């Protein structure tokens, strides 16, 4: 079995890290009062209550 290419390994690692950082940034922005569109929208309260019931928050 041949060793894996370092370039391929770096691509996979940085892709996963990029998604993690993107999700972290989106959740931080979403938790701020100015950009929290889930609580400010008309159907947002219903969506939040459904998510809380689903995840037990």
From Swiss-Prot:
Q: Name one Pfam family in it.
A: LHC
User: In the record, which positions carry N-formylmethionine?
Assistant: 1
| MF (Gene Ontology) | bacteriochlorophyll binding; electron transporter, transferring electrons within the cyclic electron transport pathway of photosynthesis activity; metal ion binding
Q: How does it sit in the membrane?
A: Single-pass type II membrane protein
**Membrane-spanning intervals of the chain:** 11-30
Which of the residues are on side Periplasmic? 31-57
Cytoplasmic-side segments: 1-10
UniProt xrefs under InterPro entries: Antenna_a/b (IPR000066), Antenna_alpha (IPR018332), Antenna_alpha_CS (IPR002361), Light-harvesting_complex (IPR035889)
Cellular-component GO terms for this entry: organelle inner membrane; plasma membrane; plasma membrane light-harvesting complex
GO BP annotations listed: photosynthesis, light reaction
Q: Which residues bind a bacteriochlorophyll?
A: 26
Keyword Cytoplasm attached: no
Q: Where in the cell is it found?
A: Cell membrane
Keywords, in A-Z order: Antenna complex, Bacteriochlorophyll, Cell membrane, Chlorophyll, Chromophore, Formylation, Light-harvesting polypeptide, Magnesium, Membrane, Metal-binding, Transmembrane, Transmembrane helix
Q: Where is this chain primarily localised?
A: membrane
- Function statement: Antenna complexes are light-harvesting systems, which transfer the excitation energy to the reaction centers.
Record NCBIfam families: pufA_517_ASD
Q: Which family does it belong to?
A: Belongs to the antenna complex alpha subunit family.
Subunit comment = The core complex is formed by different alpha and beta chains, binding bacteriochlorophyll molecules, and arranged most probably in tetrameric structures disposed around the reaction center. The non-pigmented gamma chains may constitute additional components.
User: What is the protein's name according to its record?
Assistant: Light-harvesting protein B-808/866 alpha chain
- What is the scientific name of the source organism? Chloroflexus aurantiacus (strain ATCC 29366 / DSM 635 / J-10-fl)
Cite the source lineage. Bacteria, Bacillati, Chloroflexota, Chloroflexia, Chloroflexales
Query: Which gene is the coding source of this polypeptide chain?
Result: puf2A
């Amino acid at each position: 079995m041949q060793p894996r290419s370092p370039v391929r390994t770096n691509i996979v690692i940085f892709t996963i890290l990029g998604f993690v950082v993107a999700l972290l940034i989106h959740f931080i922005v979403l938790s701020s009062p100015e950009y929290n569109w889930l609580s400010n929208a008309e159907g947002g309260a219903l969506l939040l209550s459904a998510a809380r019931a689903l995840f037990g928050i």
